[in-house]
C-alpha cells in the first residue's frame, strides 16, 4: 500500500507546508494531492510543489470538470507532467450542483455522461492517435452548434506528452464509483469506513465488468483519504475532524443531494447524518459539530495516542486499496504512518 499526502485547498490565504511535504517525500510517501472548491485552484500549488521536490508524484483530488474544457485539462496535465519528469496524476470530478451552477455558472446536467465524455476526450488528446474529433451529448468537437463560425477544424496536440498519465475520478456515490471502475485508473474517496468496504466493492466490480480492458482490485487504485491527528487528548484530537465532518455532511451539498452525507448513511450512521445535516442547515453549526459521534470519527480517521493509531492502522492495511491518502499537519504523523506502511 502506497501513501499519499493530502494538502487540499487553501482558505483565505494560500498556504503550503513545504517542510511537511518534503518530509513526506523523504520518508517514502508516493504522492501529494491538492484540491479545489471555490477559492484556490488545484493545479498552481502542484507546480510550486513540483519545482521543490524530486520524486513524489503530484495529484489533483480533484480538478472540477466545469472549471476547464477537456482540452484545457489535457494541456495542463501534459505540461505539468513534462515539467515534473512524469510525476503527474490527474484526478477529475464533477463536483456538486451547488458549486457547478452556483460558482461556475453551468448546468449540473447528466453528470455521469459528462464525466464519461470528459475522460474519453482527455484520453484521446493524450494518445495523439489523430486530430481530435468527438460527437457526444455534452461535447461536440469541432463545435458546430449555435453561434459557430464553421471554421473549427480537428487538431492534434503539438506537445508530445506521456500517453499513460493516470486518470482518477473522485466519487462518493454508487453509480459514479461504478463508472470510475469502468473508465478510470483509480477512485478518489473523500473518506471511507474500512470495515464497510462492502458498501463500495459491488459498484467497483460492476464497473470492472464493463471496462474495455481487464481490471480488478489488484490493478485499480482505490485511494481513500484518512485524517491523522496524534495526541493523548482524544477529545482534542477528534474536534477538528468533527468540524470537518459536520461541514461535509451538513453543508457540502443541498439537503436532498449531499453525496458525503449519503455515504455516511450507507455505512450505518443514518440517524446521525440526518441530525447533523438538519442542525447545520438550520445555522446551528456548533450543535452540528457536537452531534458528530465519536464512533464515526474513530471509524473514518486515525486519532489519539501513537499506540492507538498503530492498532487502528491495521484495518486500513488489510484492505485492497492501492493508495492511502493521509490528511495531517503533523510531521510526526507522516513519519509514523510511513513506518507503519513499510512494516
Language-model segments: what does each one mean?
Residues 1-343:
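Active-site-adjacent structural elements that line small-molecule/cofactor binding pockets in enzymes
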Amino acid at each position: 500500500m502506497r501513501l499519499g499526502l493530502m494538502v487540499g485547498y487553501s482558505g483565505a490565504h494560500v498556504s503550503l507546508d513545504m517542510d511537511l511535504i518534503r518530509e513526506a517525500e523523504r520518508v517514502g510517501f508516493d504522492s501529494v494531492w491538492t484540491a479545489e472548491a471555490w477559492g484556490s485552484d488545484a493545479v498552481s500549488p502542484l507546480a510550486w510543489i513540483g519545482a521543490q521536490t524530486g520524486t513524489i508524484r503530484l495529484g489533483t483530488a480533484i480538478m472540477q470538470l466545469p472549471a476547464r474544457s477537456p482540452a484545457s485539462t489535457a494541456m495542463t496535465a501534459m505540461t505539468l507532467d513534462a515539467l515534473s519528469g512524469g510525476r503527474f496524476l490527474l484526478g477529475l470530478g464533477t463536483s456538486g450542483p451547488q458549486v457547478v451552477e452556483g460558482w461556475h455558472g453551468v448546468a449540473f446536467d447528466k453528470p455521469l455522461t459528462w464525466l464519461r465524455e470528459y475522460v474519453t476526450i482527455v484520453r484521446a488528446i493524450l494518445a495523439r492517435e489523430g486530430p481530435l474529433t468527438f460527437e457526444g451529448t455534452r461535447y461536440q468537437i469541432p463545435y458546430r452548434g449555435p453561434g459557430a463560425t464553421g471554421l473549427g477544424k480537428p487538431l492534434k496536440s503539438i506537445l508530445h506528452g506521456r500517453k499513460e498519465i493516470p486518470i482518477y475520478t473522485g466519487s462518493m456515490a454508487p453509480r459514479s464509483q461504478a463508472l470510475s471502475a469502468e473508465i478510470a485508473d483509480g477512485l478518489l474517496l473523500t473518506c471511507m469506513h474500512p470495515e464497510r468496504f462492502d458498501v463500495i466493492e459491488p459498484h467497483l466490480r460492476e464497473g470492472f465488468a464493463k471496462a474495455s480492458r481487464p481490471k480488478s482490485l489488484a490493478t485499480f487504485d482505490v485511494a481513500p483519504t484518512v485524517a491523522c491527528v496524534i495526541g493523548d487528548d482524544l477529545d482534542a484530537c477528534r474536534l477538528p475532524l468533527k468540524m470537518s465532518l459536520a461541514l461535509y455532511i451538513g453543508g457540502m451539498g443541498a439537503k436532498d443531494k449531499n453525496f458525503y452525507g449519503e455515504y455516511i448513511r450507507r455505512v450505518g450512521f443514518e440517524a446521525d447524518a440526518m441530525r447533523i445535516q438538519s442542525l447545520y442547515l438550520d445555522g446551528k453549526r456548533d450543535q452540528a459539530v457536537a452531534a458528530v459521534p465519536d464512533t464515526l470519527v474513530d471509524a473514518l480517521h486515525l486519532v489519539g495516542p501513537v499506540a492507538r493509531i498503530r492498532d487502528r492502522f491495521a484495518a486500513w492495511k488489510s484492505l485492497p486499496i492501492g493508495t492511502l491518502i493521509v490528511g495531517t499537519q503533523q510531521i510526526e504523523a507522516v513519519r509514523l504512518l510511513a513506518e507503519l506502511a513499510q512494516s
